[in-house]
Amino acid sequence: MSRIGKNPVPIPEKVSVEISGLTVKVKGPKGELERVLPDGVSVSQADNAVTVSPSDTSRRSRERHGLCRTLVANMVEGVSKGFSKKLEIIGVGYRAQVKGKKLVVSAGYSHPVEMDAPEGVTFAVENNTLVTVSGADKELVGNEAAKVRGIRPPEPYKGKGIKYQGERILRKAGKTGKK
């Protein structure tokens, strides 16, 4: 049995959970999330907690036990607190701004790169160089942050590019001239 999976997921106040078969719907102040869990697990709600247990003793069920518990826990945390990722833009002339629901990034290309925010994700920019991607769905926030970073990943020689806040970039020594 999974050590993570056997812990119940506490449900805070102002959050409601509906379970029908393998479909879990979570509603809270930050939004509403719905997910269909994979086969091999059973989900139940008692008191103010959601419990995930394997439906049988097969290897597949035991593998998915901890995963499903974590997915439900992330849904509950997302609708109550929300998730966010911060990215730093480093480089001369590199900047970002928000126009409506679009993020416009100038990262050294001949044209600015525009990204639309999907449903449930918001972009915020501070000082033209700090981008915050936030929303209720942890997976969606992480994917959008990775797409923003993918516009201009940090390079190892000067460190220019878009990186996660707190990410360490291994720097390389440049070429040495002939002396």
From Swiss-Prot:
Pfam families: Ribosomal_L6. The keyword RNA-binding applies. GO terms for biological process: cytoplasmic translation. PROSITE patterns: RIBOSOMAL_L6_1. InterPro entries: Ribosomal_uL6-like, Ribosomal_uL6-like_a/b-dom_sf, Ribosomal_uL6_a/b-dom, Ribosomal_uL6_bac-type, Ribosomal_uL6_CS. One of its GO terms (cellular component) is cytosolic large ribosomal subunit. One of its GO terms (molecular function) is structural constituent of ribosome. Keywords: Ribonucleoprotein, Ribosomal protein, RNA-binding, rRNA-binding. This protein binds to the 23S rRNA, and is important in its secondary structure. It is located near the subunit interface in the base of the L7/L12 stalk, and near the tRNA binding site of the peptidyltransferase center. Part of the 50S ribosomal subunit. Belongs to the universal ribosomal protein uL6 family. HAMAP family: Ribosomal_uL6_B. This is Large ribosomal subunit protein uL6. It comes from Synechococcus sp. (strain RCC307). The lineage of its organism: Bacteria, Bacillati, Cyanobacteriota, Cyanophyceae, Synechococcales. The gene is rplF.
